[in-house]
């Protein structure tokens, strides 16, 4: 990926007029190569794991699936932002490179390299637009603090085990017991920040509110997807903290259900919506239900990217009111309706089945209290999404309906994914 990044950078600097096309085609070519490797892995009768660089890098079918999903998100974002300068596409590919290193790393030090590469690219992407300085600074300072916690956690793990390799760490964790509690807490704090879980969620509404929708399509998808897909790899480092993680996830979706009612700005509403959904996702991880976990990640990321792509088509002033113009644009209006109903987790849309799997996971292990909390939070959140639909389609349009450019390939692909849960049930 680094060679591709360097080659693409030279091409974009030479023909910066076609930077968007060059970056998209380069990333598409890399996606096709990874897809071919994934198909080769899938054709084997036995599960195969490849190690490179003396065990620093690990590659298997599940990691390849995660990489393909990350690259798919990057392709959608790049296709939507093809008119931006070559600097944006360079940083976007740099962020994807960091995510790839983070997911394939089998050593904490190499993971940190990918983690920081992704962070640095995100900082610079957020600073590209005028007016985003405050949001970028808030995210930068908060991220710097929690990155320090991550480095402290790694230093403690190394001091206790004498290694940063995952294999050695996983073996030593079985013998150290409570001695690793402090580094696990530090690691959990960093994860909570990156995902916006309570109590490390305060940056999310402020940063979302200060960014344009184009940048939110990156901020709300790739960095969070990278962390979510990385969590199963390091689960042995967090096995003692599963109850804490479950409590944080429950607090997140409960807080989201309560505070969504007080939001009159679209982006802050979306921020608290993200906090709630990520709480549900992490709850599935905390109870060890990887089936529900992977399914929810897939549905949530597709729906999130779809809503940002759609909302970025609207005039960005008083966005909560501007959605009412969608009733004059039937294609976008239908897309908006499907996306919101998916985020509200109403049947027969795919978001309902994702949340239902988490509910069944709670019931199977006897966590009835958490199941009740999930139902109550889901019902309360769904009411706010339905109110959003009511405002959009049944209120008076406050502004003249402006012409909106519809990207039909993106719209159709998102609708097929979200409106046909029967096809997604094949994944169950």
UniProtKB/Swiss-Prot annotation:
GO terms for cellular component: mitochondrial inner membrane. Keywords: Electron transport, Membrane, Mitochondrion, Mitochondrion inner membrane, NAD, Respiratory chain, Translocase, Transmembrane, Transmembrane helix, Transport, Ubiquinone. The keyword Chaperone does not apply. Its main location: mitochondrion. Its EC number is 7.1.1.2. Pfam families: Proton_antipo_M. PANTHER family: NADH DEHYDROGENASE (PTHR22773). Core subunit of the mitochondrial membrane respiratory chain NADH dehydrogenase (Complex I) that is believed to belong to the minimal assembly required for catalysis. Complex I functions in the transfer of electrons from NADH to the respiratory chain. The immediate electron acceptor for the enzyme is believed to be ubiquinone. This is NADH-ubiquinone oxidoreductase chain 2. It comes from the Eukaryota. InterPro entries: ND/Mrp_TM. Belongs to the complex I subunit 2 family. One of its GO terms (molecular function) is NADH dehydrogenase (ubiquinone) activity. It is a multi-pass membrane protein. It is found in: Mitochondrion inner membrane. The keyword Protease does not apply. The chain crosses the membrane at residues 22-42, 59-79, 84-104, 108-128, 140-160, 185-205, 218-238, 241-261, 269-289, 292-312, 332-352, 356-376, 384-404, 408-428. It catalyses: a ubiquinone + NADH + 5 H(+)(in) = a ubiquinol + NAD(+) + 4 H(+)(out). It comes from Hyaloraphidium curvatum. It is an enzyme of class 7 (translocase).
């Amino acid at each position: 990926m680094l060679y591709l990044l360097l080659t693409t950078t030279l091409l974009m600097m030479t023909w910066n007029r076609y930077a968007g096309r060059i970056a998209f085609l380069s990333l598409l070519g890399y996606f096709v190569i990874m897809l071919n490797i994934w198909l080769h892995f899938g054709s084997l009768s036995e599960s195969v794991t490849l190690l490179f660089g003396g065990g620093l890098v690990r590659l298997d079918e599940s990691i390849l699936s995660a990489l393909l999903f990350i690259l798919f998100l990057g392709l959608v974002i790049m296709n939507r932002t093809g008119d931006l300068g070559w600097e944006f596409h360079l940083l976007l590919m740099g962020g994807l490179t960091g995510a790839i290193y983070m997911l394939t790393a089998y050593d904490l030090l190499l993971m940190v390299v990918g983690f920081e590469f992704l962070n640095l690219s995100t900082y610079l992407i957020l600073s590209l637009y005028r007016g985003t300085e405050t949001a970028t600074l808030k995210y930068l300072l908060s991220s710097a603090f929690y990155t320090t916690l991550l480095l402290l956690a790694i230093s403690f793990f190394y001091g206790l085990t004498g290694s940063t390799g995952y294999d050695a760490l996983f073996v030593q964790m079985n013998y150290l017991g409570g001695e690793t509690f402090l580094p696990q807490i530090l690691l959990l704090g960093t994860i909570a920040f990156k995902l916006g879980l309570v109590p490390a969620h305060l940056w999310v509404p402020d940063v979302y509110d200060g960014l344009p929708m184009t940048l939110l399509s990156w901020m709300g998808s790739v960095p969070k997807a990278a962390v979510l897909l990385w969590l199963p790899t390091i689960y042995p480092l967090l096995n003692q903290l599963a109850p804490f993680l479950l409590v944080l996830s429950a607090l997140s979706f409960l807080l989201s259900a309560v505070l969504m009612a007080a939001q009159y700005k679209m982006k802050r509403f979306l921020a608290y919506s993200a906090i709630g959904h990520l709480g549900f996702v992490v709850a599935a991880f905390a109870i060890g239900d990887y089936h529900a976990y992977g399914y929810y990640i897939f549905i949530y990321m597709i729906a999130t990217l779809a809503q940002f792509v759609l909302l970025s088509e609207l005039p960005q002033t008083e966005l909560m009111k501007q959605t009412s113009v969608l009733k004059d644009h039937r294609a976008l209006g239908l897309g908006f309706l499907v996306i919101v109903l998916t985020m509200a987790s109403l049947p027969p849309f795919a978001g309902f089945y994702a949340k239902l799997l988490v509910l069944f996971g709670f019931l199977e292990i006897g966590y009835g209290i958490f199941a009740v909390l999930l139902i109550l939070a889901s019902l309360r959140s769904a009411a706010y999404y339905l109110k959003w639909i009511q405002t959009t389609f049944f209120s008076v349009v406050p502004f003249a309906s402006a012409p909106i450019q519809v990207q039909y390939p993106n719209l159709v692909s998102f609708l097929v994914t979200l409106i046909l849960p029967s096809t997604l049930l094949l994944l169950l």
